[in-house]
């Protein structure tokens, strides 16, 4: 059973707390017992955490879950996925996806560079103070590693993620 530590569960609800919205309904909708949150060492099943992330996004109507100055309407990632669905290479997919997000949002500027057969995908939170526990930065990295890997049906080995924190 794949699990995720409570830190990520608590961190993802930052936007709910900032907007003074109740967290318990989101936990319950995701199938997470709110009592579990009292124990920092407790782990939560990945399916429940995925439901919680989606619930937070839907509650806030913000795919960036309140970690950026401007919201990112729910459905934008799906629109990007549709846009890149006809790409024939990983490079083309990443290029179109980066251009798309840079066009629609200034909150997480992205850059794709290539050198000697390697690609470097970089991004920086425009207002890192809105992501105090670096949840969104880490979540964004996971998304941009897993989505292309799923799309091409092959593993993509990270050579070395680098963080500014």
Where are these regions (language model features)?
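N-terminal low-complexity or simple alpha-helical regulatory segments
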Residues: 1-121, 136, 157-160
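DNA-contacting interfaces and partner/effector-binding or oligomerization modules
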Residues: 109-165
